[in-house]
Amino acid sequence: MKNIVPDYRLDMVGEPCPYPAVATLEAMPQLKKGEILEVVSDCPQSINNIPLDARNHGYTVLDIQQDGPTIRYLIQK
């Protein structure tokens, strides 16, 4: 995947689930169509919650990268 530069970053490292998913869904409506939010989380359950919730709300999950316990999501409105 080419190098995508997000418009905004939401750092949820250290926050327990479901807060990363909830915060992602609260942040997304503030973006303009086409803008990208980077979400960083170390909650293991977020790998299931964040992509599913984003898709269910009509957002596009562009990329998911895991580096040790940290998971990085790129979500486009």
From Swiss-Prot:
The lineage of its organism: Bacteria, Pseudomonadati, Pseudomonadota, Gammaproteobacteria, Enterobacterales. This is Putative sulfur carrier protein YedF. It holds the Pfam family TusA. Belongs to the sulfur carrier protein TusA family. It comes from the Bacteria. It comes from Escherichia coli (strain K12). Coiled coil: none annotated. The active site is at 17 (cysteine persulfide intermediate). PROSITE patterns: UPF0033. The gene is yedF. SUPFAM superfamilies: SirA-like. InterPro entries: TusA-like, TusA-like_sf, YedF. One of its GO terms (biological process) is DNA damage response.
